[in-house]
C-alpha cells in the first residue's frame, strides 16, 4: 500500500450484510460505532468501537489482527511515544484502559471520578450498545441519533420531502406507546 493509494476496508468482514441477524459469536466479533483511530509506526491501526466495547488492531490492508475487550464506551485512543502502550478512554464507565500492544491485551484499567448522575450513567450505554440492539452487532440507536441528538429527519424513505412523523414519546407503564421505528 502506498500513501497515495486509497483503500476501503470493511471493519466487519465476517458479516453477511444480506442477512438481518447472525450468531452470537459473530455479533461479538463486530466492531460497533467506531470512534477513534490511531496509527502505529508499523502502519497498523488501532480502532475503538464505542458500541461494542472493544478495540481492534488492523493491518494496513484492513485485515483484523487483534480484538481487545475494554471498558464501556471506548471513544479516545492515545499511543505511547514508543508504541508499547495504547491508552483508551472508556466514556461510559469513566475509566482509562492501558493496552499492552505487544500482547494485545488490557494490562490495567484506571477508574476516574465521573460527576454524571447515576441514572444517566446507567442508561446511556443502552443507546450505543451494538451487541444488544443489532442483529449483526455493528449498529445501535446511536448510529442514527448521533451522540443522542435529534436529527430532525422524517425518515420516511418513500417520501424524503415528507413532514416529520410525530409520535407519543411519553411511553409510561400501562399506556399504549406509538410504534415509531
Where does each model-flagged region fall?
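Signature of short aromatic-glycine-proline-rich micro-motifs recurring in repeat-based ectodomains
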Residues: 22-38, 73-74, 141-142
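Short loop/turn segments immediately following the C-termini of beta-strands
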Residues: 50-51, 91-92
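Conserved loop/turn motif of beta-propeller repeat scaffolds
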Residues: 42-43, 83
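Short loop/turn segments that connect beta-strands within beta-propeller blades
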Residues: 2-4, 59-63, 100-104
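Electron-transfer interface patches adjacent to heme c in soluble/periplasmic c-type cytochromes
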Residues: 76-79, 83-89, 104-121, 128-181
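Beta-rich catalytic cores
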Residues: 33, 51, 73, 119, ...
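Surface-exposed loop and turn segments in beta-propeller and other repeat-based domains
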Residues: 1-30, 110-125, 130
Amino acid at each position: 500500500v502506498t500513501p497515495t493509494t486509497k483503500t476501503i476496508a470493511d471493519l466487519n468482514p465476517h458479516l453477511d450484510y444480506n442477512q438481518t441477524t447472525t450468531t452470537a459469536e459473530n455479533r461479538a466479533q463486530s466492531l460497533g460505532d467506531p470512534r477513534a483511530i490511531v496509527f502505529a509506526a508499523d502502519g497498523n491501526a488501532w480502532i475503538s468501537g464505542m458500541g461494542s466495547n472493544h478495540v481492534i488492531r488492523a493491518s494496513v490492508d484492513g485485515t483484523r489482527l487483534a480484538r481487545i475487550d475494554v471498558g464501556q464506551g471506548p471513544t479516545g485512543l492515545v499511543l505511547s511515544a514508543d508504541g508499547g502502550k495504547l491508552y483508551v478512554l472508556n466514556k461510559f464507565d469513566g475509566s482509562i484502559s492501558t493496552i499492552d500492544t505487544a500482547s494485545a491485551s488490557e494490562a490495567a484499567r484506571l477508574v476516574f471520578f465521573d460527576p454524571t448522575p447515576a441514572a444517566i450513567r446507567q442508561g446511556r450505554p443502552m443507546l450505543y450498545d451494538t451487541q444488544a440492539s443489532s442483529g449483526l452487532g455493528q449498529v445501535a440507536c446511536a448510529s442514527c441519533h448521533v451522540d443522542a441528538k435529534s436529527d430532525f429527519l422524517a425518515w420516511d424513505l418513500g417520501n424524503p420531502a415528507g413532514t416529520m412523523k410525530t409520535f407519543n414519546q411519553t411511553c409510561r407503564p400501562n399506556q399504549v406507546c406509538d410504534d415509531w421505528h
